[in-house]
């Protein structure tokens, strides 16, 4: 029991020494820390950051609100330029033409004379969150450039005389860049050709009707004559073909019988066989020739016993 009490007292003393050492360390840390920065310096830094964020938010809101009244244009911004604008607050108020590239399919051909576009090549190029939106900082000061197509249309319309204001061809030329739908009539293609080309005068309807009736009657008579001639030729051809077939049927067996007959050569008496005896009549050779020719004519045997 005494040993346990002594050990407990030792542990208590060690805990007290540890607490005192921790308190001493706290006092040393407070004494070694540098004097705190003045509050006005911190307030200035915070105000600058807040002002920069407010300016960026205002620019984004203005771009989004004015996008409906301007054509779409893709603005490419780089991360390096954003860092420069964050470090230098004066760079935020610079015009958008110095920081971005504007792409417009209809007005890219005309170049500015008073201000040249500088193309910057950076490593990390990304499309900004308000891409395909154009700011109107420069649109209020100067007019929008015209493309070559608009200039050509103006030159074409200047030479033309004043015509009917309701003519859709003149509205097509004068309002070529307008995106309103153009409504055409049923005979729009004919009107277009009549206005743009010098067509000859059409003949009167009465003359056309008379000429068309006469030509139709002539064509009808010619077709009837051709059909009658064709029927007569076909009938004559059928008759001739039937006569030719009859003649050919009568001539075919004579042609088959007139083919050359292989006559067996004469051999000595001791080489003769019963199938090739020379004493047999010529009917035997005719019979063998008819069998080889394959004709369907009936075979008349004069001497059946001799063949056997």
Swiss-Prot record:
Functional note: Inhibitor of the serine/threonine-protein kinase pak4/pak5. Acts by binding pak4/pak5 in a substrate-like manner, inhibiting the protein kinase activity. Required for the proper migration of neural crest cells during embryonic development, probably by inhibiting pak4/pak5.
Family affiliation: Belongs to the INKA family.
Classification via Gene3D superfamilies: Phosphorylase Kinase, domain 1
InterPro entries (alphabetical): FAM212, Inka
Region annotated Inka box 1, chain positions: 164-201
Stretches the record annotates as Inka box 2: 281-308
GO cellular component terms listed in the entry, alphabetical order: cytoplasm; nucleus
UniProt remark on domains: Contains 2 Inka boxes (also named iBox or inca box). The Inka boxes bind and inhibit PAK4 by binding a substrate-like manner.
UniProt record, GO biological process: cartilage condensation; cartilage development
Protein name as it appears in the record: PAK4-inhibitor inka1
Biased composition (Low complexity): 87-98
Organism per entry: Danio rerio (Zebrafish)
Swiss-Prot/TrEMBL induction comment: Expression is regulated by the transcription factor AP-2-alpha/tfap2a.
């Amino acid at each position: 029991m005494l040993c346990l009490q002594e050990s407990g007292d030792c542990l208590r003393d060690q805990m007290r020494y540890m607490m005192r050492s921790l308190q001493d360390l706290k006092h040393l840390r407070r004494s070694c820390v540098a004097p705190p920065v003045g509050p006005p310096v911190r307030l200035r830094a915070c105000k600058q950051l807040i002002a920069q964020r407010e300016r960026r938010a205002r620019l984004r809101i203005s771009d989004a609100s004015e996008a409906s009244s301007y054509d779409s244009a893709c603005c490419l911004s780089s991360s390096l330029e954003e860092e420069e604008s964050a470090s230098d607050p004066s760079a935020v108020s610079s015009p958008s033409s110095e920081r971005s590239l504007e792409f417009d399919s209809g007005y890219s051909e005309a170049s500015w004379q008073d201000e040249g576009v500088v193309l910057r090549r950076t490593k990390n190029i990304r499309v900004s969150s308000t891409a395909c939106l154009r700011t109107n900082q420069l649109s209020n000061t100067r007019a929008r450039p015209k493309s070559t197509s608009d200039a050509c249309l103006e030159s074409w319309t200047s030479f033309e005389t004043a015509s009917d204001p309701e003519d859709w061809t003149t509205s097509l030329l004068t309002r070529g860049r307008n995106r309103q739908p153009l409504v055409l009539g049923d005979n729009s293609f004919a009107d277009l050709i009549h206005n743009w080309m010098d067509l000859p005068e059409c003949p009167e309807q009465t003359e056309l009707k008379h000429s068309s009736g006469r030509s139709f009657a002539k064509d009808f008579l010619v077709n009837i004559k051709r059909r009658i001639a064709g029927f007569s030729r076909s009938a004559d051809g059928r008759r001739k073909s039937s006569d030719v077939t009859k003649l050919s049927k009568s001539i075919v067996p004579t042609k088959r019988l007139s083919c050359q007959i292989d006559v067996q050569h004469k051999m000595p008496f001791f080489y003769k066989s019963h199938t090739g005896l020379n004493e047999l009549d010529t009917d035997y050779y005719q019979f063998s020739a008819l069998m080889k020719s394959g004709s369907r004519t009936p075979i008349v045997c004069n001497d059946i016993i001799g063949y056997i």
